[in-house]
Each structure stands twice: as C-alpha cells, then as structure tokens.
C-alpha cells in the first residue's frame, strides 16, 4: 500500500487498564514509535534489530502500560517511505499490568527457531512474535509449540514483512520459551514478552 503511514482498523479496547504491545516490521528499518487516537504514549522495549539477510530491514517492539482505550481505537506507525513494506501487530492484554521480561533473538535457517527465555514471578500472559526472513516467493506457515496459540498472522507470498503472533497464559512463576516450525525453511527474528499483573 502506498501511504506515509500504516494504521490498524478501528478496534474496541478497554477504557482503562490494558497493556498494549505493538511489534513493527519494516522493509526500511526506522525508529519511529507508534501513535494512536486515544492519546497513549508507546515506549520502545529494547532496541530495533536488523535482519542478517536483509540489513536494511528489521523489527522493533513498543509497549504502553495502563493504556486508555476506546471504540474505534486505531494505532498508527509512520513509514520511512510511502512504498515501504511495513507490518504492524497490536496485542491488547486486558488488565495487563507490567512488562516483566522481554527477549529478542535472531535464528538463521537450519537451526531450531527457539526464542530466548523469559522469566516470570507469578501468573503472566506470554506474547511471542515470529518474523520470518524468507524471500517474497511462496506462502509461509509458522506454528509455535509449548501451548502457544497463534492469534494473528501475515504469511502470504509477496513483498511484505511476514509475521505471526501467538500467546500463552501461564499460571505460575517460571522460565518459558517457544520454538516455531515454519515453511519454507527459513530463519526468523523472535520476540517473547511476559506481561504480569501488577
């Protein structure tokens, strides 16, 4: 899509108390944080990371704790140029609390696509992103293990930044990771976040 920004379609979010996570993949990596139409401020978690195979492209993760919500809530990210391949993934954690741990890892093709581990001190929602590094040909698949459930994905062939997002609710303190299986064979950038009630 040719546009100076990319926005989610209007969604209904809780009026108060949610944690919003925004994971962004760009064909031309840029450091601009998301904005929204509810007046929230998104803070970057860690740093942006480029792909080994695509050194101009990369991903970044942002969060807003205790977010204000609304009907028709739209989150927007600026694009470094109008024709940039940009993918935006938004996850709302109702009554989310605080980001307890966040980890990133890049795994190249031929190795298990296992994320770095996050540690919680109690019950938490885990949110994982898979950003594959395959080229434009063929539709993709990305399937997580360890009881994670895919909640959204962009896996079609074509000039886009492919992504899958998955979640898992854990009931106790512990250390957790996730391994993805994908087709065609490829590497990926892997994010894993633990959001824990305050």
Name what the model sees in each region:
Residues 1-122, 130-198:
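Function-critical acidic carboxylates
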